[in-house]
Amino acid sequence: MFNVNINKTPIEDVLQISFDRFTDDRGFFSETLRVNDLPFLKNTNNIVQINESYSKGSVIRGLHFQWSPYMGKIIRAIQGEIYDMVVDIRKGSPTFGKGLIFKLSSSLENKQDNMLWAPPGFAHGFFSQDDCLIEYYCTGQYSKPTENNISPIASDIDWSLANSEYVDLFKEIQLTATITDKDRNGNTLKSWLESVDSENFIFNSKGSNE
């Protein structure tokens, strides 16, 4: 990876990553992942699964998470633009219930790529205005018996730390976006806390559990 920058966000452990593309008259070349360039992966099982997701315009997905095994995700747009969302679901965390929204985009003209690290202990989803293709690098293999979700439109999510422009856009797109019944009717933060499964995500001073 070329000229990697890893930047903190308003919620500890959630990280923004950017790196350069090598460009010339032929086009560009980019290393999209080199584990040794991403020190936060040292506390994980490294990348064990890669997913690709295509979404049509005006779609909301999420907010998903799992345990046994825990799954952290590095998310990048391959084509188009998404607004990536993460919400802290760790019991006892000082930022429990708070969410962030980041714009991730990619085009052939970009000289940089950007990605987001959503560690275990965070529910993840996104919304799109236009068609988009994204890729996930995952630190755990998918496990249907231990997956769960928070509804992205749950009224008790606190978006006060998120970019206000993106929050307003999210509120607007909710009126017309396509969202599955499973995602729409997912947990609120209150019902998640009341679930025995929430004991799988306990905040500690060392960060997210894995």
PLM segments and residue spans:
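Non-catalytic, conserved peripheral segments adjacent to functional cores
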Residues: M1-K111, C132, Q141-P145, I150-E210
